């Protein structure tokens, strides 16, 4: 930083007894430059909201396909257990072995 004095050293007016002048003397300095950096700012952005909607659906029936009458397939009566699977003809578990009902709750496979 450089400074200079604009004060005049030439006598002003009649020669005084003291070495002084009636004009003000100001010390002037060059302008300064300051770089002010703002402090860091933390911004929190919300993350995605992950939702899961598990859907498990069971389709089937535990009731007989024939309501109010007796149903038979090949002279074999079909009960409640046999109504699931192969179109309600007393066969269940297609691909896992065929099972049906004989008479009153007797199951054959």
Swiss-Prot record:
Domain of life: Eukaryota
Modified residue annotations for N-acetylserine: 2
Keyword set, alphabetical order: Acetylation, Keratin
A Pfam family hit: Keratin
Cross-referenced InterPro entries: Keratin
GO molecular function, a single term: structural constituent of cytoskeleton
A single Gene Ontology CC term: intermediate filament
UniProt KW Transcription keyword: no
Family: Belongs to the avian keratin family.
Alphabetized PANTHER family for the sequence: BETA-KERATIN-RELATED PROTEIN-RELATED
Protein name (Swiss-Prot/TrEMBL): Beta-keratin-related protein
Organism (species): Coturnix japonica (Japanese quail)
């Amino acid at each position: 930083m450089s400074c200079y004095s604009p004060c005049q050293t030439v006598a002003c007016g009649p020669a005084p007894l003291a070495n002084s002048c009636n004009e003000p003397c100001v010390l002037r300095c060059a302008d300064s430059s300051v770089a002010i950096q703002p402090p860091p700012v933390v911004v929190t952005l919300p993350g995605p909201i992950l939702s899961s909607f598990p859907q498990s659906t069971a389709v089937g029936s535990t009731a007989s396909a024939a309501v109010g009458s007796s149903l038979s397939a090949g002279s074999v009566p079909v009960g409640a257990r046999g109504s699931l699977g192969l179109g309600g003809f007393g066969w269940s578990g297609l691909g896992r072995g065929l099972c049906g009902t004989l008479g009153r709750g007797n199951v054959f496979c």
